[in-house]
């Protein structure tokens, strides 16, 4: 059995299924480039047959990413598989991931197919896919709740037809670690040709055990691929968290005995990028990537860490991308110092023009904020990369007036395509007034589901505010994120960012979990 663990990232497919986490083509491409820097083995770029937008995103990623295998999901039918193959045509290494449900509940209630019909559909789909691509992954949806005897028949059949990876999903997060690990092991032992494929795990977090179940599937079951997402992003309670699985295997190599290709120093930049793009803020106590992951408040702990870090730290913050350099930048810092901080933070901009634009934003921020921290730099770079996407709505100017005893009002100038709009409105506060001013011109009628503010850095009233806005329109939910030292400006940016996602909406068909 191989001692190499394959990391299969599905942030751009399964992660995006989280309500409000929809991403544009350019956002997906930007995250894919970061995943390549992270050195994940496989990037599931999307579900090419679900929409024209997803097809274009998969195609764009396949055309530019060279160091990771690019994968597209496809239902077990010729149309989906052909569409996936077409989108992946430019990939250096391509994989088609096809699936069909195998649990009695799904076959009867959703598919309305008999077990024999499902078995035949699985066989034919893998055979068809193998004629188009040499790397085929098969998933029995709701595999963990499937009858083991029937599941073994399906898995044996698809291996015979050319499946190279077998992925066993715990689609609804029902599994318990020991039981799931034994389930994978029993399948491997009972399927006669199991040695001809790599076994994979895909766990959801409904009971909070996605990471534990995945690791049990590896250690007990012998799986050699883990499907996961950055920050554990995903529908309902989320997916297995990439950063947690990777650091568990790396930190406890004495137990797992497995090697990883992942460059762990790129974990925090990837986490920050996904959080900023989707609007799903990372909780402070999140393992590995949370703001408090390496913080020590207890005096006893602080004393121990100062004397010897390994008294209370089992991994180093800098190993996962938290900078060990505590130098704070300011308005006198030059371009070279700024570029060095980008390098230290693992941020790779695509061109000198992007570096120059980010540096100009840095100087503008430094004029308004005396000290610039790493978190500020990560936020402004993400903001700059979003600006480069030629978005439909762009904030041009904003002013607001608020006095005690008077109703606040705001004036907003923004562009919608090539048209410049000026709007004025009052409101219950300056944020409310600003959003009402924008809405008076765009007239979407979108429902505001969420408005939240987080301080990007702590310990100062100068901290930038990061605002997340969640809108719903016609059954579609989107998030927008904006950052600025002025909370009102950050709020307007976030609202326009959400409107941009509504403007570029694309209908998608449902995928497996």
Curated annotation (Swiss-Prot):
It catalyses: 3-methyl-2-oxobutanoate + acetyl-CoA + H2O = (2S)-2-isopropylmalate + CoA + H(+). One of its GO terms (molecular function) is acetyl-CoA C-acetyltransferase activity. Its EC number is 2.3.3.13. GO terms for biological process: L-leucine biosynthetic process. Its cofactor is Mn(2+). The keyword Protein transport does not apply. Catalyzes the condensation of the acetyl group of acetyl-CoA with 3-methyl-2-oxobutanoate (2-ketoisovalerate) to form 3-carboxy-3-hydroxy-4-methylpentanoate (2-isopropylmalate). It is an enzyme of class 2 (transferase). Pathway: Amino-acid biosynthesis; L-leucine biosynthesis; L-leucine from 3-methyl-2-oxobutanoate: step 1/4. Mn(2+) binds at residues 14, 202, 204, 239. PROSITE patterns: AIPM_HOMOCIT_SYNTH_1, AIPM_HOMOCIT_SYNTH_2, PYR_CT. It comes from the Bacteria. Belongs to the alpha-IPM synthase/homocitrate synthase family. LeuA type 1 subfamily. The lineage of its organism: Bacteria, Pseudomonadati, Pseudomonadota, Betaproteobacteria, Burkholderiales. InterPro entries: 2-IPM_HCS-like, 2-isopropylmalate_synth_dimer, AIPM/Hcit_synth_CS, Aldolase_TIM, LeuA/HCS_post-cat, LeuA_allosteric_dom_sf, LeuA_bact_synth, PYR_CT. Homodimer. Residues 5-268 form the Pyruvate carboxyltransferase domain. It is found in: Cytoplasm. CDD domains: DRE_TIM_IPMS. Residues 394-513 are annotated as: Regulatory domain. GO terms for cellular component: cytosol. This is 2-isopropylmalate synthase. Keywords: Amino-acid biosynthesis, Branched-chain amino acid biosynthesis, Cytoplasm, Leucine biosynthesis, Manganese, Metal-binding, Transferase.
